[in-house]
Amino acid sequence: MTREQVAELSLQDEFRLAGKRYEQGQALLAEAQRQISDGTWLWNGGDVRPLAASGNAFGEAPDGATTGNSYFFRAARIIERDGASGAAADLEPMQRYFDDKGWRSGSAKVGTDLEVRADTGDGWWVTWSVRPNGQSSIGVHSEAFWTNDTKALVRATSARDPATFPDASKPGVSEPFPEWSDPVRH
């Protein structure tokens, strides 16, 4: 949506739109996780709350985006796989997935980690990082989305989010995005 279209939305409308975007990111995360393992993944914090964007989101922030008028989502999971060593070969299953999807992707060495990342072409990025200790992580990150007031949207979400999440789960398990009608915590 354009900045002008978002300007016409109420906070409740933006909240519902953020929920749809959150669900899109969670579906992408689950699909990408399954390329590696249907087993148990460790959570790296909660996923529900939108984050102030501007230049913090993946991709290129739209002109005029600030931390006060844009937000993004990110979700990450960690897995330790038998035989994984942080070698380039550990990137191959995810790189194949990216190639099969036709997504623009690239790889890099980040400290001691190797990473491959892809732009889905519809506002999302997927990252897959492998480490020498055999631990690997997957991340899903949105590009910046417009909002009328980042703080108000974050507060509206946070006040309705019970902030509970599992320590670990299989792909497809996610925190439900709160409903506007959920009780507001103070």
Model segments located where?
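Amphipathic alpha-helical segments
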Residues: 28-35, 85-105
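Surface-exposed patches in mature extracellular/periplasmic domains of secreted proteins
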Residues: 40-45, 103-111
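A short linear-motif detector with a strong N-terminal bias
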Residues: 21, 50-58, 95-98, 105-106, ...
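Short, Lys/Arg-enriched charge-dense amphipathic segments
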Residues: 57-75, 126-141
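An acidic-aromatic pocket/loop used at catalytic or ligand-binding sites
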Residues: 1-36, 106-186
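Terminal, regulation- and interaction-focused segments at domain boundaries
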Residues: 2-20, 61-93
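Early exported N-terminus immediately downstream of N-terminal targeting peptides
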Residues: 15, 19-71
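N-terminal start-of-chain detector that recognizes signal peptides
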Residues: 14, 49-50, 88-89, 99, ...
